Each structure stands twice: as structure tokens, then as C-alpha cells.
Amino acid sequence: MTRQLAIELSGRNIRVNSVAPGFIDAGMSAPIYEDKKVRKTRSEAVPLGRLGTARDIAEAIMFLDSEQGSYVNGHEFVVDGGVVHSLLNQLPRD
């Protein structure tokens, strides 16, 4: 959907991107991380070694909305501390 909208709206100088958050300790998910075992397990699953914050997500969005991000269009920004890429390494190779 993001890519298609980016294609359709780019002629109007409208950029469309999306942000896909990982394990974020904020808002509705905050109660989940009150459990110390869950917090530890999920933090250890993140290559950066910590849960994300609302600020991490906001910074990605601010970049996309800034002059520095003005040539980015049609992309999904995965803000997960590297989880997606680390999981790919765990898949069986045969």
C-alpha cells in the first residue's frame, strides 16, 4: 500500500512512507514490559540490546518529514534495533 500510494501521489509532490516499529516500551505495550522476564527476553532478542522507545519511533518519523528525508518515497522504515535481520540469520539454510 505504501509503495502504491507513493507512486500515485508523487506527481502532487506528496511522499508516502511507513514506519514499522519493533519491541517498543511505550503506550499500550508498556504493561507487557512490567514483567521483568518478558523485558529481559525481548531486550536480549534485539541486537542493540534494548527495547525501543517512543522517541526512537518519533525520530524516524521526524527524519522522514525533514529536508534530509525529502528524497525518500515509498519505503517502510523498520525501526526495530535489528531484530528482523537477526531473525533471518536463524532460519534453516537447507
Positions of PLM-derived features:
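A short C-terminal helix-loop "cap" of Rossmann-like NAD(P)-dependent dehydrogenase/epimerase domains
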Residues: 32-46
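Short C-terminal tail/terminal secondary-structure segment
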Residues: 62, 73-94
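Active-site loop of short-chain dehydrogenase/reductase
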Residues: 11-14, 75
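Short, flexible catalytic-loop segment of classical short-chain dehydrogenase/reductase
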Residues: 21-31, 85
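A conserved structural motif in NAD(P)-dependent oxidoreductases
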Residues: 46-57, 68
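Conserved SDR Rossmann-fold cofactor-binding beta-strand/turn motif
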Residues: 15-21, 25, 65-68, 78-80
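Alpha-helical segment proximal to the catalytic Tyr-Lys
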Residues: 7-11, 70
